[in-house]
Curated annotation (Swiss-Prot):
Positions contributing to Zn(2+) binding: 206, 261, 265
Organism field: Bombyx mori (Silk moth)
All copies of domain Chitin-binding type-2, residue ranges: 42-104
Keywords: Carbohydrate metabolism, Chitin degradation, Disulfide bond, Glycoprotein, Hydrolase, Metal-binding, Polysaccharide degradation, Secreted, Signal, Zinc
Assembly with partners or alone: Interacts with CPAP3-A1.
Sites carrying sugar chains: 244, 296
Gene, per the UniProt record: CDA1
Pfam families linked to this entry: CBM_14, Ldl_recept_a, Polysacc_deac_1
GO biological process: chitin catabolic process; polysaccharide catabolic process
Full protein name: Chitin deacetylase 1
Location in the cell: Secreted
UniProt-listed InterPro entries: CE4, Chitin-bd_dom, Chitin-bd_dom_sf, Glyco_hydro/deAcase_b/a-brl, LDL_receptor-like_sf, LDLR_class-A_CS, LDrepeatLR_classA_rpt, NODB_dom
Record bears the keyword Metal-binding: yes
Start and end residues of each LDL-receptor class A domain: 121-157
Disulfide bonds: 80-93, 122-134, 129-147, 141-156, 168-180, 173-178, 230-489, 354-361, 391-397, 497-520, 503-523
Length: 539
C-alpha cells in the first residue's frame, strides 16, 4: 500500500509540475501575443490623426462598411448600417452611391510644416515649410500654397495656425464695435438676466417662391405683435434659383430681413469648405447684387450670410465678408451647452470649439459678427433621457414626429434660454418642413401665440436687430422704445406690383436650361449667374 501511495504522490507531483510548466508557457505565449498586438496597434496608429477612422482592407462590399479608430483605450471598430458605405474623406457613413473612395484605406496624408522644432530653423518673422524652406510667417494659412510642398496650408486649425486670432481681451474688445467673452456666455452690458429681453430669431433658408409664400403669410399675418406693438419679424437666407424676386421685395417691404445663401447652392459640400475668396465673393456678393437689383432693395440692408449645408468656409469666407462689407455670418454651430452662447465678433478667438464633421472654421481675426447657431436640445424628457447630440436646424431634429412633440421641444428649448442667460433663441427652418407637416405648423403657431400672450419680455426679431441690441444693450423696460426694433413697425399699403414680369431666361453658365425669373422690374437679357449677376451680359 505504501508503494502505491508513493506512486500516487509522485504522479501528483508530476502533474503539478506539468501544470506549472503549462501555466508558465501559456503566460509566455500570452505575453508574446500581447506584445505582438501592441506592436501591431502602434504600427496601425502611426501617423493617424486624433479621431481618424481608417480601413484595414480596402474594397467594395463589407470592406467599405468597416473602419477602425485608434483611441486611448485601444482599437475601436464600427460598421456602417446596411445600404451605407464609409466615406474616408468625409469621415462618415453615407449612401453607397455617394461614396467613391472604397479603395482608399486612409485619408490623404498631408505634409505638415515644421512649426515646432528644438532649434529655430528660420530667422524672426519666418517659418519653415515641411521641406525646411523658410517663408514669411504671414503666408501661412492664407488660403494659398506658398511652400513648394503646400505644407503652409496643411496645419491651419485654431491650435496650429501661427497667425491665429488671440484669446478674448475684454479691455480691448469694447462695444459697439467688438464683443467677446472667454466662454461666450457673458451678457452684453453686464445686464442681469432678468432685465434682458428674450430675443427669438426665426429664419428660413433657400428660395422664396410660390411654394412657400402662403406659408410665410400665415405665420407673419400682421396680427402677431411683439410687446412694443410691432409685427414679429424673421430673416430669410435667400438662394437664387427659382426665387420670385417680387416676393422678396414684398417680404423686405414688410420689415423682414433679407440675407444671402449663395447663387448656385452648390451640392458638393466640400466646395464650400475649400472655396477661394473669389469663389465666395461670386456666390455671396453676387447674390446680393441679384437681390438688390431684381427686388429693388436700395437701403444697404442685405448684410448677412449663411453658407449652404452650414459648411463653414474658414478664413476665405470671412476674408470675403470683410472685403465685401457684410455685417454678420450665421453658419457656425456651437455644440449643445448650458448656458447658451451670445453673438460675438471675430476679432478674437471663437469661444467654443469648431463643431461639426470636417468643418473649416476661421482661425484669424476678422471684422465680422457671428450670429452663432446654438444647437437645440432634442431630448423628449430632459430630466431623464440620456444625452443626445443637439441639432442646429429644427428640421434636422429627426426625433420630432408629432405636433405635441414639437410643442414640447419648443417649450423646453425656450426655457433653456429664458431661465439662464437669455441668449437669443434661434429657430432655423426650411419652409418645406412646416408646409409638408400641417401638425407641426399648427403647433408652431400655437406656441408663438402662447409665448406672446404670456410674456411681455419676449421679442421675435431679425438677425440684424439682435446685433443692434448687443451693440447697445437695453433692459426689458427700455426695449419697448428701442428705435432699431421699431423700424417698419407695422407696414401697410400695397406691394410694388400685383403681377410681376415672368422672364424666361437662359445663360451660358447654365447650359440647356430655360429658367423663370419673376420681378417687378424689367427683365434682364440673360439669367443672372456667377459671372453675370446683373444679367446684362457683362462677363
Amino acid at each position: 500500500m505504501a508503494r502505491y501511495a508513493r506512486v500516487a504522490t509522485l504522479a501528483a507531483c508530476l502533474l503539478f509540475a506539468c501544470a506549472l510548466a503549462d501555466g508558465h508557457r501559456w503566460r509566455r505565449q500570452a505575453d508574446e501575443t500581447a506584445k505582438k498586438d501592441e506592436s501591431l496597434e502602434q504600427e496601425l496608429c502611426k501617423d493617424k490623426d486624433a479621431g481618424e477612422w481608417f480601413r484595414l482592407v480596402a474594397g467594395e462590399g463589407d470592406n467599405c462598411r468597416d473602419v477602425i479608430q485608434c483611441t486611448a483605450s485601444g482599437i475601436q471598430a464600427i460598421r456602417c448600417p446596411a445600404g451605407l458605405f464609409f466615406d474616408i474623406e468625409k469621415q462618415t457613413c453615407d449612401w453607397k452611391d455617394a461614396v467613391k473612395n472604397c479603395k482608399l484605406k486612409n485619408k490623404e496624408r498631408k505634409i505638415k510644416p515644421l512649426l515646432y522644432t528644438e532649434e529655430p530653423l528660420c530667422q524672426d518673422g519666418f517659418l519653415a515649410c515641411g521641406d525646411s524652406t523658410c517663408i514669411e510667417r504671414g503666408l501661412f494659412c492664407n488660403g494659398e500654397k506658398d511652400c513648394g510642398d503646400g505644407s503652409d496650408e496643411n496645419s491651419c486649425d485654431i491650435d496650429n495656425d501661427p497667425n491665429r486670432a488671440p484669446p478674448c481681451d475684454s479691455s480691448q474688445c469694447v462695444l459697439p464695435d467688438c464683443f467677446c467673452s472667454e466662454d461666450g456666455t457673458v451678457i452684453p452690458g453686464d445686464l442681469p438676466a432678468r432685465d434682458v429681453p428674450q430675443m427669438i430669431t426665426i429664419t428660413f433658408d433657400d428660395a422664396i417662391n410660390n411654394n412657400n409664400i402662403e406659408l410665410y403669410k400665415e405665420i407673419f399675418n400682421g396680427k402677431r405683435k411683439n410687446p412694443n406693438g410691432c409685427d414679429i419679424k424673421a430673416t430669410y437666407f435667400v438662394s437664387h434659383k427659382y426665387t420670385n424676386y417680387s416676393a422678396v421685395q414684398e417680404t423686405h417691404r414688410k420689415g423682414h430681413e433679407i440675407a444671402v445663401h449663395s447663387i448656385t447652392h452648390n451640392d458638393d459640400e466640400r466646395f464650400w469648405s475649400n472655396a477661394t475668396v473669389d469663389d465666395w465673393g461670386k456666390e455671396m456678393a453676387g447674390m446680393r447684387v441679384i437681390i438688390e437689383k431684381f427686388s429693388n432693395i436700395t437701403d444697404n440692408s442685405v448684410v448677412g450670410v449663411r453658407a449652404p449645408y452650414l459648411r463653414v468656409g474658414g478664413n476665405n469666407q470671412f476674408t470675403m465678408m470683410e472685403e465685401q462689407a457684410f455685417l454678420y455670418d450665421s453658419t457656425i454651430t456651437a455644440p449643445l451647452s448650458n448656458p447658451r452662447l451670445c453673438p460675438y465678433t471675430m476679432y478674437f478667438r471663437m469661444p467654443h470649439r469648431c463643431h461639426g464633421n470636417l468643418q473649416s472654421c476661421p482661425t484669424r481675426s476678422h471684422a465680422v459678427w457671428e450670429m452663432v447657431m446654438n444647437e437645440l436640445d432634442r431630448r423628449e424628457d430632459p430630466s431623464n433621457d440620456e444625452y443626445l447630440p443637439g441639432c442646429a436646424m429644427v428640421d434636422s431634429c429627426s426625433n420630432i414626429l408629432t405636433g405635441d412633440q414639437f410643442y414640447n421641444f419648443l417649450n423646453h428649448n425656450f426655457d433653456r434660454h429664458y431661465e439662464q442667460n437669455r441668449a437669443p433663441l434661434g429657430l432655423y427652418f426650411h419652409a418645406a418642413w412646416l408646409k409638408n407637416n400641417p401638425e407641426f405648423l399648427e403647433a408652431f403657431l400655437y406656441w408663438i401665440d402662447e409665448i406672446l400672450q404670456s410674456h411681455n419680455d419676449v421679442y421675435f426679431v431679425t438677425m440684424t436687430q439682435v446685433i443692434q441690441w448687443v451693440q447697445n444693450p437695453r433692459t426689458v423696460t427700455e426695449a419697448k422704445n428701442f428705435e432699431p426694433w421699431r423700424e417698419k413697425c407695422s407696414v401697410e399699403g400695397n406691394p410694388a406690383c400685383w403681377v410681376p414680369h415672368s422672364c424666361k431666361l437662359t445663360s451660358k453658365e447654365v447650359p440647356g436650361e430655360t429658367i423663370n425669373l419673376q420681378t417687378c422690374l424689367r427683365c434682364p437679357v440673360n439669367y443672372p449667374w456667377l459671372n453675370d449677376p446683373t444679367g446684362d451680359g457683362h462677363y
